[in-house]
Amino acid sequence: MRTEYCGQLRLSHVGQQVTLCGWVNRRRDLGSLIFIDMRDREGIVQVFFDPDRADALKLASELRNEFCIQVTGTVRARDAKNVNADMATGEIEVLASSLTIINRADSLPLDANHVNTEEARLKYRYLDLRRPEMAQRLKTRAKITSLVRRFMDDHGFLDIETPMLTKATPEGARDYLVPSRVHKGKFYALPQSPQLFKQLLMMSGFDRYYQIVKCFRDEDLRADRQPEFTQIDVETSFMTAPQVREVMEALVRHLWLEVKGVDLGDFPVMTFAEAERRYGSDKPDLRNPMELVDVADLLKSVEFAVFAGPANDPKGRVAALRVPGGAQLSRKQIDDYGNFVKIYGAKGLAYIKVNERAKGLDGINSPVAKFLTADIVEAILERTGAQDGDMIFFGADNKKVVADALGALRLKLGKDLSLTDEDKWAPLWVIDFPMFEDDGEGGLTAMHHPFTAPRDMTASELKTAPEEAVANAYDMVINGYEVGGGSVRIHNGEMQQTVFGILGINEQEQREKFGFLLDALKYGTPPHAGLAFGLDRLTMLLTGTDNIRDVIAFPKTTAAACLMTEAPSFANQAALTELGIPVVKKAENN
């Protein structure tokens, strides 16, 4: 039906007869002439109808926005004064000789001239996706997946599919369950990841695997999460953690170079402990120049319990955050930031405004200055590198609260005061995570997942001191987003059972949930390691949007609902009966 895409016409097509198919983006009726902007997935081109083609002109008078049409005409160059530099096709136009209205459009529920609500955009997603910016994002996503496949194929990886209907295993979130009609009362689970299957593939001898795969997690959603999402899933045998990181870094550098024309360079590597200490986060945004600086040793003897208490507590921390130019902040702004850090458990926000450093105590403004000597103030200013016009905020509490509160404040100030370089790319690897963390109930939970191997520990050493274990794990972070994470896996049955035991999974439970894995580990399992990237998040970064729903064709809301299809929906009684699922009705209030 078409010979060319609208958005691909250029001066090289001048004089050619073309047939285009697409939609009316805009119509301008000048009486004897009618101009339309015609749109398809590749872009927009101007088409005009003149009196010499009376039939086409007459039919064009009926056109309205979003009519689906076919146009045949001749490409010609625009006069210099009519060139539109803002359009890729702005140097040419199409003189229409014939027009076919394929389908008319009713009054549109989305307004092209105004910002539509996200609810409306999701309800009429098929119209929203016609917008050039949305089409471009999905085209970029398609390009990314194509680049990934070619790169992985070139590096000897095999694309192998794993099951969608599998067994529920604890991986950190709730499973989506699918009832079995054949096995009444039993349920499949949709996979949260292909984790165990890709490990089993390594045990099967396929030493380089990848898959672009759908995963499902029934969890509370955030702006950058969806109940169903897509992973670039990777696993390798006989490769060390640095070797895996090297290949995966090369993949991401390849994507940025091909999609953005940007060479990311070599990624720095930072330990979890260093990231938390310097940035208050295990996914630091290195575009932001501010860092947390420890000052507890300077404050142990001050007559101010808010500082002295944590400074003398082995589990406590006192840290300072220097804000360049922050002395300009008003009292109201400071109070607002004080309320902000309370969200993260902080009790308040002490500060020092540096007006004239050379004047010592007389050159600062601080509600805690009366508790500090001139020498202590000077030592704090020296350590933080403070200059005239800066602000220093303090966090004093247990280590987690200080990291969480000042880490979040750092990000907020970076944005509010334009200190974060939005034009920069800042990737890094974060390694050496704790293997376990407190579950809040006196037990331990796996920081990544229970199949991650510890670094340099035997099973007996791990059993004796699990809190000291460092995971052989690694996360890739770009601009403060965790875009991928992975680890070296446990390939020894004794170690795997030890980890299960530390997590409170008894032997009977181990057999019920992971018997197939424990059996497989008995038969010459190779050392293996892998990683998974979030394709949605990678695409979000590469397309410059901050909403993950913008890069998914048909996303869910933050309530895990599809406004367009009205999913989820009630199942009819016959279907439930066939599945052996009884419906319990709530008793009515009398």
Swiss-Prot record:
One of its GO terms (molecular function) is aspartate-tRNA ligase activity. It is an enzyme of class 6 (ligase). It catalyses: tRNA(Asp) + L-aspartate + ATP = L-aspartyl-tRNA(Asp) + AMP + diphosphate. Residues 195-198 are annotated as: Aspartate. GO terms for biological process: aspartyl-tRNA aminoacylation. It comes from the Bacteria. The keyword ATP-binding applies. ATP binds at R217, D218, E219, Q226, E482, G534, L535, D536, R537. Keywords: Aminoacyl-tRNA synthetase, ATP-binding, Cytoplasm, Ligase, Nucleotide-binding, Protein biosynthesis. One of its GO terms (cellular component) is cytoplasm. Its EC number is 6.1.1.12. It is found in: Cytoplasm. Disulfide bonds: none annotated. InterPro entries: Aa-tRNA-synt_II, aa-tRNA-synth_II, aa-tRNA-synth_II/BPL/LPL, Asp-tRNA-ligase_1, Asp-tRNA-ligase_1_N, Asp/Asn-tRNA-synth_IIb, AspRS_core, GAD-like_sf. Homodimer. Belongs to the class-II aminoacyl-tRNA synthetase family. Type 1 subfamily. PANTHER family: ASPARTATE--TRNA LIGASE, MITOCHONDRIAL, ASPARTYL/LYSYL-TRNA SYNTHETASE. Catalyzes the attachment of L-aspartate to tRNA(Asp) in a two-step reaction: L-aspartate is first activated by ATP to form Asp-AMP and then transferred to the acceptor end of tRNA(Asp). This is Aspartate--tRNA ligase. The lineage of its organism: Bacteria, Pseudomonadati, Pseudomonadota, Gammaproteobacteria, Enterobacterales. The gene is aspS.
